[in-house]
Amino acid sequence: MMDLWTAAQALILGVVEGLTEFLPISSTGHQIIVADLIDFGGERAMAFNIIIQLGAILAVVWEFRRKILDVVTGLPKQQQAQRFTLNLLIAFMPAVVLGVIFADTIHHYLFNAITVATALVVGGVIMLWAERREHTVRTETVDDMTWSDALKVGLVQCLAMIPGTSRSGSTIIGGLLFGLSRKAATEFSFFLAMPTMVGAAVYSGYKYRDMFRPDDFAVFAIGFITSFIFAMIAVRALLKFIATHSYAVFAWYRIAFGLLILATWQFGWIDWASAKA
């Protein structure tokens, strides 16, 4: 039987996942921090994280359903659809290879709040530098991307294996530096999230399959639905925001949040060193 506090924990973490998954502020980092603050851990947390990530990715699938349908129906004959699909596969593969090789090691050594805080600050500084650097836009839309554009974005996505880095942050900022327009970089980041997150969820789901229990269905349902709703809100808001704004506000948020975590640890207010995902 699910108690009220467990339901509240599921709701809180679902909101955090939904709001942060597609913003360049690191959803994994926020999950580690918030889960530690509300004391949500153990085997249930491992399975729960997989479920709420699926909720978030479903929001992107729904938001871009027309584009996805156009690509799927156009695959047999349309060169544009074929090239777009190939670019996604090319961008996806580096994360598959490096994820299989290094995922367990990274999770063991780097999934802690101090790593998250450091990565938030460093990533924020890099984002500010990238935003202030002059960009020569070579690629206006995702349909104009070349296979080399896709490969480079896929390689920088691998940096997000370090918690606190941000998958969307690394791919969007990387895309800007590689000559993609702000719109193209953001949209390709969303599309690339689909195979990347689904692949990670399937891999983790199989690996931790014994942690899924029927008794946790209600907890998972709350997290899944909440994550879906708030991810939808975040995706739509970000697409509107980037049309007229830079990513600097996210960079400053990362720096401030990371420094706050480091300060509370340094002064001994919170024992972040023991916080694990």
UniProtKB/Swiss-Prot annotation:
GO terms for molecular function: undecaprenyl-diphosphatase activity. It comes from the Bacteria. Keywords: Antibiotic resistance, Cell inner membrane, Cell membrane, Cell shape, Cell wall biogenesis/degradation, Hydrolase, Membrane, Peptidoglycan synthesis, Transmembrane, Transmembrane helix. Its main location: membrane. It is an enzyme of class 3 (hydrolase). The keyword Transmembrane helix applies. The chain crosses the membrane at residues 5-25, 44-64, 86-106, 110-130, 184-204, 219-239, 255-275. GO terms for biological process: cell wall organization; peptidoglycan biosynthetic process; regulation of cell shape; response to antibiotic. Its EC number is 3.6.1.27. InterPro entries: UppP. It is found in: Cell inner membrane. GO terms for cellular component: plasma membrane. It is a multi-pass membrane protein. It catalyses: di-trans,octa-cis-undecaprenyl diphosphate + H2O = di-trans,octa-cis-undecaprenyl phosphate + phosphate + H(+). Bacitracin is thought to be involved in the inhibition of peptidoglycan synthesis by sequestering undecaprenyl diphosphate, thereby reducing the pool of lipid carrier available. Belongs to the UppP family. PANTHER family: UNDECAPRENYL-DIPHOSPHATASE. Catalyzes the dephosphorylation of undecaprenyl diphosphate (UPP). Confers resistance to bacitracin. This is Undecaprenyl-diphosphatase. It comes from Pseudomonas savastanoi pv. phaseolicola (strain 1448A / Race 6). The gene is uppP.
